Regions:
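Helix-adjacent hinge/juxtasegments
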Residues: 55-57, 66-69
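Small/polar-rich, solvent-exposed N-terminal microdomains that initiate assembly or binding
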Residues: 1-52, 88-93
């Protein structure tokens, strides 16, 4: 069952839907001097609501970072990811429906010493997680 891999499920969906020119990695961009993107979990509660049957309603915040040599393209791709996920429902391989909503628009973060510019946007992901059956 999908639990801790919500970031992977949502980022893979966005990557395929937009046919991005790079892979969206989890937690970091592996190459320090190349274009890329990553998604990170923002600090958030493990569950918004827990129910007596063991199920729960979960809300997680994800931030997508896009880093590129071309600052304009970095902003554009960050905005495309945001627009694609805003209002989307992503279905995980095990059938979990994840409702996505943009929390922020694409925001400039930094231009590093190598000339790579980073933009980021936050996406809220809500889903109902049924109780586990043993």
């Amino acid at each position: 069952m999908t639990k801790s891999n919500i970031a992977e499920v949502v980022s893979e969906w966005a990557e395929k839907a937009l046919q991005l020119p790079f892979t969206i990695y989890c937690d970091l961009i592996p190459t320090a001097d190349a274009d890329g993107a990553c998604v990170r979990h923002d600090p958030s509660p493990a569950a918004e609501k827990r129910f007596l049957d063991g199920s729960r309603y979960v809300s997680r915040n994800l931030t997508f970072y896009v880093r590129m040599k071309n600052a304009e393209q970095a902003r554009e791709l960050s905005q495309q990811i945001t627009d694609k996920l805003d209002g989307a429902t992503v279905t995980s391989p095990d059938g979990l429906e994840i409702d996505c909503e943009a929390v922020t628009l694409s925001q400039y973060i930094d231009t590093d010493s190598k000339g790579l510019t980073t933009y980021a946007a936050a996406i809220k992901c809500d889903y109902y997680e049924p109780a586990e059956t043993n």
